Amino acid sequence: MISLKSIVDKLYNLEDLSYQESYQLFDYFIKGQIELPLQTSILIALKLKKETSIEIAAAVEALFDNTKEFPKIKGDLAGIVGTGGDGFNTINISTTAAIVAATAGYKVAKHGGRSVSSKSGSFDLLESFGVNIELAPDQTKQCLELYNLGFLFAPFYSDGFRHIKEARTILKTRTIFNILGPLINPARPNKVVIGVYSKDLILPMAKTLVNLGIDRAVVVYGSGLDEVAIHDDTYVAEIQNNQIIEYKVSPVDFGIYTYAIKDLEGGLPEQNREIIKQILLGKGKEAHNAAVAVNVAMLMRLYDKDDLKQNTQEVLEIIKSGKCFNTLQQVINYSNK
């Protein structure tokens, strides 16, 4: 076993960790074997050094090895998630996109937690709607099979996250746990859209996904946002057959108008709940509908639907039908049975 001191000394010298060192470090973290002051300094050292794809992949495996198992789902399973920490406090776009994608017929396992650095995390929102976020894994699997949608609350599957919650709250900044969150979905989706908070993270995240054997994925950075943007360019790394292709898309590629970031500002969970409810009922603002649609359109690429304009139009029609709220309502009802 590698000593914590030797790992910490390397980090304080801003040296990269080996796979084994990173695995051991995150095993210590998730088992609550690191004191709070040291936790914060380790997280800051990693942030200053910049995390490597090897460190991230090792951390993912350490966290998976300490996670409650989720029963395997047959066929394709999608994940759509952002790292958070983009600082703009937008409405919960990836959560809404997951509900819309499920309504469109794609099985989506949405993994996440409560807010750390924003006003409203994905599961703050879901709780405000009345979703039982601590549904047993076998029930969540059945919910996925019935309604194409399942919600997996991170602390429920890995109670070790309670050991690092205080450090993350104290730091009030993005840490490696923002990066790890999207990668440790216990349902192990084989098709994922991951939004990152920095352009510098696109390639390390994509390389990590290749290392983890993910079938198809896109990593996106939306000019300040951790999702596909409707205000400016979105930088993309797409993974197929273990190859990474980098490109850039803009709102015009989706056939939509360009909006401002402020058009997507959210608020407290209750305010976000009302905004999201209106979108799902087919009564949302154009900017809100567009933001959700482009993210689902990007997910559809992973199912060999390459025409982003056509994808976006199909999704907008589904949103405007109001059917998406029925999907959420069915999941709420099922989760509280």
From Swiss-Prot:
Pathway per its UniProt entry is: Amino-acid biosynthesis; L-tryptophan biosynthesis; L-tryptophan from chorismate: step 2/5
Enumerate the residues binding anthranilate 1.
82
UniProt KW keywords:
Amino-acid biosynthesis, Aromatic amino acid biosynthesis, Glycosyltransferase, Magnesium, Metal-binding, Transferase, Tryptophan biosynthesis
Q: Where does Mg(2+) 2 bind?
A: 226-227
Q: Which reaction does it catalyse?
A: N-(5-phospho-beta-D-ribosyl)anthranilate + diphosphate = 5-phospho-alpha-D-ribose 1-diphosphate + anthranilate
Top-level EC class as recorded in UniProt? transferase
Q: What is its EC number?
A: 2.4.2.18
Amino acids binding 5-phospho-alpha-D-ribose 1-diphosphate: 82, 85-86, 90, 92-95, 110-118, 122
GO CC terms of this entry: cytosol
Residues noted as binding anthranilate 2 in the record, renumbered to the chain: 168
**What are the GO MF terms of this UniProt record?**
anthranilate phosphoribosyltransferase activity; magnesium ion binding
Looking up PANTHER family in the UniProt record yields: ANTHRANILATE PHOSPHORIBOSYLTRANSFERASE (PTHR43285:SF2)
Q: What does this protein do?
A: Catalyzes the transfer of the phosphoribosyl group of 5-phosphorylribose-1-pyrophosphate (PRPP) to anthranilate to yield N-(5'-phosphoribosyl)-anthranilate (PRA).
Tell me its family. Answer: Belongs to the anthranilate phosphoribosyltransferase family.
> Assembly and partners?
Homodimer.
- Kindly provide the name given to this protein in its UniProt entry: Anthranilate phosphoribosyltransferase
- UniProt source species: Francisella tularensis subsp. holarctica (strain OSU18)
Which gene is the coding source of this polypeptide chain?
trpD
